[in-house]
Amino acid sequence: ANLSFGNQFKVGKYELGFITSLSYKKEFNLFENYQSNRYRKDSKNIFELRDVELLSGPLSIESVFPSALVGIGLKSPKSRYQAQIMHLQNGSSNAAIYNSAITYGSENEQKRDVLEYNQRSVTNLLLYGKHFLFDGDLTAEWKISPTFNENKDKDIRYSPFRTDDGGFVIEPSETGDPTRIWRDLEERSLVSKIDLTYNYTLNDKKAKLKAGGLVSLKKRDFYIETFAILFRGAIPGIKSSGDPDLFLMADNIWNIND
C-alpha cells in the first residue's frame, strides 16, 4: 500500500510547498525444502568435493516494510529553505526446522529448531538552505543531515538435537548447546557542509571565488547478549517429542532451593 500527497501555494511573497509519502509492504515466503550444504576439498588430485554437512528442511520468512517521508520547503526572493525527514524500517521473522547430516569428523544426524527476529531501520533528517546576498553576488548554501541506523536481532533461538534411533537427544559435545542470542547495533552519523560562491569581475571577465567546509561525524555501538542452556540429567518428554519449549518449563528449571 502506498499513499503520496503534495502541494505548493503562495503565502504573500513566499512560496510554500510540502510532500508526504507513506508506504507499507508485507511479504511471506515458504521454502519447503531449503538446503544449505558444506563441502571440503581433500586433495589436489581429487576433483570431487567431500560432504561435510548436508542441511535441509522447511524455512518460512515473514517480512514487513513500512516507510514514511515528509518534506516542506519555503522560498523567498533571497532565500530557500527545505526540511525533510525519512524513515525506512524492515522487520523479519524466520522459523525453520532443519535436518542436518554431519558426514565428516563426528558423524551424526541432527534436528535443529531455529527462530529468528530481526529489525532494521534508517532515519534521516535533511535541513537545507540557500541564500543570495549582496544583490546576488554572494551565494551561501548549507546542509545539515543527521542519520540514525539500527540493526537489532531481537531474538535468536537455536535448539539442536541429535537424532538417535528415531528419538531426540541433547548432546552438546556433538550438536552444541541450545542458545538464545540478542544483538544490537546502533549507528549515529552527522554530515554538515557549507559552500560560499562569490561572483565578481576580473579584467572585464566574469569570475567566481568558491570556498566551503565539511564536517562528518560517526558513532557506533554494538553489543551481544548470549546465554546457553545447560542440562543436568534428562528432561521428561524430550526424547520422544524433540520439543524445545520443554527447555524452560518451570518444572525443568533448576532451583537453588531444591
Question: What is the predicted function of each stretch?
Answer:
Residues 1-96, 120-125:
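Transmembrane beta-barrel wall of Gram-negative outer-membrane proteins
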Residues 33-44, 88-90, 97-109, 156-166, ...:
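Flexible, surface-exposed loop regions and adjacent strand-edge segments
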Residues 57-59, 108, 112-116, 181-185:
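Outer-membrane beta-barrel domain signature
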Residues 75, 79, 84, 118-258:
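Face-selective signature of the C-terminal outer-membrane beta-barrel domain
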Residues 91-96, 105, 109, 113-122, ...:
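Generic N-terminal amphipathic/basic segments
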